Amino acid sequence: MGNHFVNWNEVDVNTPELSFRGMRIVCKVVSVYDGDTIKVVFPFLGRLYKWNCRIDGVDTPELRTRSALEKEFGYFVRDKLREKILNQVVYIECGNFDKYGRLLVTPFLKGMDIAQWLIENGYAFRYGGGKKDSWSEYLVVKKRKNNNNNNNNNIVLKGCVVDDENVKIDVEVQGEVVV
């Protein structure tokens, strides 16, 4: 099927690899696995194809980990990302493929850099390769600080809801709820 048009004698290790590096592509997000792994669909060679992508420049908590705290926050972050981009038409800036074959991308929704949104909301660490920061250590320290605040009757963060227009923070101060 089509092989009769290829001169296989000219094919060797120097044949270029498929690359979308530097391209901006309009696509639809069809799946969000976790906070930094998504599937998108976009046209290529006249057909629609699904691509596994990793959001470039960030690291989010893992879903498959022994740390219950990290896993819980991982599902929270995944759900926030789903609320933001699942089934949305976005454009992606493409990089290389990572070691797992995923296309490294920076997704944009209505001009908003989703990687930056993840970082600004505390859902992701910046990540440029190499050793990752420990989500488990970060979350344990954060939980310990909250517990210490409880013991000292200081301000305790009870909840934070952020949407496109509002930020609502509930705190408890010496038994009173302040909104």
Briefly describe each language-model feature range.
Residues M1-V179:
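Small beta-barrel nucleic-acid-binding modules, primarily SNase/OB-fold domains
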